[in-house]
Amino acid sequence: SLDAGVLLYLLEQGWDAKRVEKLLYKESGLLGVSGISADMRTLRGEAAQGNADATRAIDQFTHRVIRETGALTACLGGLDLIAFSGGIGENDAVLREQVCERLAWTGLRIDPQRNLQADGKHAWAVHAPDSRIEIWVIPTDEGRVAAREAAALLREDCAVAA
């Protein structure tokens, strides 16, 4: 999370909106913490080679996923199903296993073999038979989602200009 005061400070230091936007959307997150990459696959490879910065970025990301999922679970009064999607959720079996292990108190039980078999191309149930909550890996066509969002923004801009 980011203290809003940081944004005010950067603007006071002469940063323009484009530079702040680049910092927030291009230079933060996994890249900002690791100094290496925003790609989890790259970071996993670096961490396997002993890179402490990559390990720190992965650990922080995993912690935040667990924290936010736990908070949402509390707000919702429980879970019926958890879905892992998007590039990392679809493709990172280690992350899915770590998240489910830390949220075992909710009744989540992941099947390690099924988790490894999820291919990111098909919806795949990865919960163990004794799990009280279903766990799914759901593929996302991120390119299509981005194109839809861009088209919506263009329609919005055209409507305003008309």
Question: What does each model-found stretch correspond to?
Answer:
Residues 1-45:
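Conserved ATP-utilizing enzyme core subdomain
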Residues 2, 6, 25, 47, ...:
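Generic, low-specificity signal for short hydrophobic/alpha-helical stretches with a mild N-terminal bias
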Residues 5, 18-19, 38-41, 52, ...:
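Generic alpha-helical secondary structure signal
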Residues 8, 53, 87:
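Conserved short-loop catalytic and cofactor-binding motifs
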Residues 22, 29-33, 40-75:
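Adenine-nucleotide phosphate-binding core of ATP-dependent small-molecule kinases
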Residues 55-75, 79, 83, 89-160:
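Internal helix-turn-beta structural module
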